Design a protein with these regions (language model features):
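Conserved functional acidic sites
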Residues: 1-191
Length: 191
């Protein structure tokens, strides 16, 4: 997928929600509003995709349930939680032909525990590692064709910082154990 940089900004923070705006430097910044409950935080869409997929697919998320990140009580080694999304996706464009599909993304997230991680933004001794396994089920328009794709990735979170590293070992059927897609925090500012 190559190397890309982006800026992520948090705003409109309340007890029940906050907005994350992602600016990749090209085009309009992308914003979504997360909800916060006693169970944890839920992103309205699956936004953990690695960079480089811009322009390939248009996705409209129509359902989100479960928890993206759990409450502090659940964010403990050995705990797990689920997240589920349903989306309508369009691949291609009107000129060359479009393929419409419904995607269901079902994920199980497992808190592996704390470990040290080094990224350009610094060295963190107590990053919480979360391993995610998931299945993307795609129903291809009116064709009746359905396919499933396994997805596996690990994320490292640091208290008072957030996500500092994410590594996709398997994405859309492409094994990446020898060359995973990696996102790392370059820098951050306390607000």
């Amino acid at each position: 997928f190559g190397v890309s940089n982006f800026t992520q900004t948090y705003s409109d923070v309340t007890d029940n929600s906050f907005t994350i705006t992602i600016d990749a430097g090209e085009g309009e910044p992308f914003a979504n509003t997360w909800t916060c409950t006693g169970e944890g935080m839920l992103s309205p869409e699956f936004s953990q995709m690695p960079g480089g997929m811009e322009g390939m697919v248009s996705i409209d998320f129509i359902e989100a349930e479960g928890v993206t990140l759990p409450s502090e009580e659940m964010f403990q080694p050995g705990e797990s939680w689920t997240t589920r999304y349903v989306a309508e996706a369009v691949i291609g464009d009107a000129a060359s032909g479009e393929l419409t599909m419904t995607q269901t993304i079902e994920m199980t997230n497992n808190d592996i525990g704390s470990e040290a991680v080094s990224v350009p933004a610094g060295d963190f001794d107590n990053a919480i590692r979360v391993d995610t396994t998931g299945v993307v089920t795609m129903a291809m328009g009116d064709t009746g064709m359905t396919t499933t794709i396994d997805m596996n990735y690990s994320s490292w979170y640091v208290e008072d910082v957030g996500l500092v590293r994410q590594e996709f070992a398997s994405l859309f059927g492409t094994e990446g154990a020898n060359n995973p897609s990696v996102t790392e925090l370059l820098s951050y500012e306390d607000q």
